[in-house]
Design a protein with these regions (language model features):
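Intrinsic disorder/low-complexity polar-acidic segments
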Residues: 69-206
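N-terminal low-complexity, intrinsically disordered segments
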Residues: 1-92, 205
Length: 206
């Protein structure tokens, strides 16, 4: 699987703040799925996407090295507007994954914001960079030629058991398909294997 990571940690880049809430929709807010695992069954995103439900369950389990802060999933389909996000994203994926447009008319994507539980790792950019190097190297070996893993290192501020500044990782899985069903299946399989990889000894022992 094609895998890469970048950093968006400049002074103008957004900071992930946890806990968070949507000012326009107070009912939409951070849920600590480590403490409230049964709330997974009631999240709109997980009700629609079983693969996302399973990934969140695995990543917030007691033996996981990370926990999650935000997530979303969405289809990527052709738009009549040549400047539309979906068209640009489809072109980008086809170019990087090496598939022609007639074979891959659609795609599916998701993101999950991750935070390392270990406070020393959470606060260290250097350790995050080492972990992201390791994760992208391991993910390349996964057999998902239609899928792409993108990781973005971001600044974070967490105030759950006392305030702390550190870093978060936005994990994107994007997958092309011959049709909507195959794109969705390719995405789900890739997401599942990346979640499993994150819970392997390579990262739990970090």
């Amino acid at each position: 699987m094609l895998s890469d990571w970048t950093a968006e940690c400049g002074p103008e880049d957004p900071v992930l703040v946890v806990p968070w809430s949507d000012p326009d929709k107070p009912e939409v807010h951070f849920i600590d799925l480590r403490e409230h695992p049964y709330d997974l069954d009631h999240l709109p995103e997980t009700e629609r996407h079983p693969a996302l439900l399973n990934a969140l369950r695995a990543l917030n389990a007691s033996r996981s090295p990370v926990f999650t802060a935000k997530c979303d999933a969405w289809p990527i389909e052709h738009s009549p507007d040549p400047e539309d996000y979906c068209n640009n994203e489809l072109t980008y994926l086809r170019l990087n994954l090496g598939y022609p447009s007639e074979e891959t008319p659609v795609a599916f994507a998701s993101y999950i914001d991750l935070l390392w539980r270990d406070r020393t790792i959470f606060a260290s950019r250097h350790q995050h960079e080492q972990l992201l190097d390791r994760l992208t190297r391991r993910a390349v070996a996964l057999d998902h030629s239609y899928a792409m893993l993108e990781l973005v290192l971001r600044p974070a501020f967490v105030d759950l058991n006392g305030p702390q500044e550190g870093f978060a990782v936005s994990l994107y899985i994007k997958a092309l398909g011959h049709d909507s069903e195959s794109a969705y299946e390719n995405w789900g399989r890739a997401l599942s294997e990346v979640a499993t990889l994150l819970r392997s000894k390579t990262f739990t022992a970090a």
